[in-house]
Amino acid sequence: MSKVSIIMPVYNAEKYLCEAIESVLKQTYADFELLLINDMSTDNSKQICIEYAKRDRRIVLLENNSESHGPGSTRNIGLDYATGVYIYFMDADDWIDDCLLQCAIHCMQETEADIVEFGVVYELDTGQSTGKCCWDGKLILQKDEIKKDFFHFWKESPLYLWNRLFRRKTVKNIKFESIFNGEDVCYSMDALSKAEKIAHITDAFYHYRYLEGSSCHRWVESTIECLGVQWTHQCRFISSLLGDADPLPYAGPAYDNYMWAIYQLSSIFCPLPFREKRRELLKLKEIMGFDRYRGIYPFELEHGLLRVKFMLVKYRLEWIILLLGPLYYRVVKRMRNIAQRKE
């Protein structure tokens, strides 16, 4: 068997940490090391890690005592310690199916791929599943095939960390950016640029828990800076694959970043007044040169409310989303609560 290193940053995750660790210990593939990296937690997370490390020698507790904190720099500590042939990243508030490692490693060995991707189930904190995201396309892709149908690859392959198993020798020289958000996208972009073959499993093994108000869904002062760094990595990947002459391949990530900024700015958790929200969005627009891509996105790929939002952006009416976003959020949340009470 070939060892896999599972890297899990831990920060104030005591409510969900046991479930995450237990889901790893239940794996049908036993040759792994679970690296728990405590990032200065102020709750009981560290003690939970200590207790599990005493019970199972495959579990190692590491500490991020550096001046740089956050998920990126914390994962880098795990990468420096990892000894596995394969690398897998997992968050401390999620959980995985028992067969994840077995299926992903079998696929990687059978296909000789550099990266194996699998599906994700989206879960609410109430225990209700809200859907899943699984690959819909050719199961094995060479780099040249990604070039031929880049937009399909981009739309169908979300840039998460935790729906991918990496071959260690492929990503050995890649490190995480020390940014508050988007470090996972940056790493995924750099890893994809190194991969010659990507294999897909159509089953969903990872359970992502959506936590209202969590750091990745919350506006912070560095959000625009993080999106700018993310854009740099995305452009580097696309340029290495397709060059710079055609702006169309860049339109997908450009819209992804711009819409993500709009989503965070229009959330009820964003404290900025309307004028400041527009100013922040203008910063991102200038960083990315967004107007170059505004009208060339293939809008027929989007449907329903999302398409409406994309069309508003196309015609420079994103201020409407910023203005009505908080109201929309409250209405949707109220409807969701009513539906849950009926169940």
Task: Please provide the spans of the model-predicted regions.
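Membrane-interface aromatic/basic loop that binds lipid-linked glycans or pyrophosphate carriers
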Residues: 269-343
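Catalytic core of nucleotide-sugar-dependent glycosyltransferases
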Residues: 205-211, 217-245, 260-293
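Glycine-rich, basic loop-to-helix element that forms the pyrophosphate-binding segment
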Residues: 64-82
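Donor-binding/catalytic cores of nucleotide-activated saccharide
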Residues: 92-200, 206-224, 243
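Cell-envelope/extracellular polymer assembly enzymes that use nucleotide-activated donors
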Residues: 2-5, 23, 33, 186
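Short, well-formed alpha-helical segments that are part of the catalytic scaffolds
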Residues: 12-26
